[in-house]
Amino acid sequence: FGKILRDLIPAGDVLSDYVDTLTHESFDIGLAGLINGSIDAVLQLGTDDNPQLWITDYKSNRLDQDGDDTLIAAYGQERLFDAMAHHHYPLQALIYGTAMYRYLRWRAPHLSNHSDLVKGFSYFFIRGMVGPTTPPNTGVFTWQAPPGLWQRLSDRLAGGAL
């Protein structure tokens, strides 16, 4: 998955450092824990003519540490990404996205360009979402997939070339 991401995401993408983890020769993680759960929700945004599906997952991780001024401070983008990478949530989301792509191909063959229907994923860290006073982007990690990603990942899982 890492090599495919390396080909598709632009330099400076928020997942660039995680791609380094995925492509490092020492990377070895069992997939059982990543695919044991389920997608919490798939949200349809966009229009009827241009539907956009977003994979969402809710997390209850405690990210606050001694020395944090406020609970909200623990759920800013930098800390969210550290938690995402530590728990391999980006890899989990890539597996979810590929599964959604395959499901659409199977159950909705009349739709065109299944790979571009699945726009990306959002992880909602609910402890950092404290109501209407929550600052924008606090507690929410969102990533938009590059065009063609899901098809390439699906092909790879089917034994295709990188």
Predicted regions, residues:
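Structural signature of nuclease core domains in nucleic-acid processing machines
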Residues: 1-162
